[in-house]
């Protein structure tokens, strides 16, 4: 399993139309859902 990198997570979420991304338990979570 790949460790979550906040910068990558955040930009992936933004590219998918979310406001921001945050790493929780090594997984990328996009907000707001």
Curated annotation (Swiss-Prot):
Q: Does the keyword Disulfide bond apply?
A: yes
Q: Which pairs are disulfide-linked?
A: 4-23, 9-28, 13-30
Name the site position(s) for Aromatic residue of the functional dyad. 31
Q: Name one GO molecular function term.
A: toxin activity
Q: Which UniProt keywords apply?
A: Disulfide bond, Ion channel impairing toxin, Neurotoxin, Potassium channel impairing toxin, Secreted, Toxin, Voltage-gated potassium channel impairing toxin
Q: In which tissues is it expressed?
A: Expressed by the venom gland.
* InterPro entries referenced in this protein's UniProt entry, alphabetically: Scorpion_toxin-like_sf, Scorpion_toxinS_K_inh
* Family label: Belongs to the short scorpion toxin superfamily. Potassium channel inhibitor family. Alpha-KTx 10 subfamily.
| Function, in words | Inhibits less than 5% of human voltage-gated potassium (Kv) channel Kv1.3/KCNA3 currents at 100nM concentration and does not block human Kv1.1/KCNA1 and Kv1.2/KCNA2 currents.
Q: What is known of its domains?
A: Has the structural arrangement of an alpha-helix connected to antiparallel beta-sheets by disulfide bonds (CS-alpha/beta).
Record protein name field: Potassium channel toxin alpha-KTx 10.5
Species for this entry: Centruroides bonito (Scorpion)
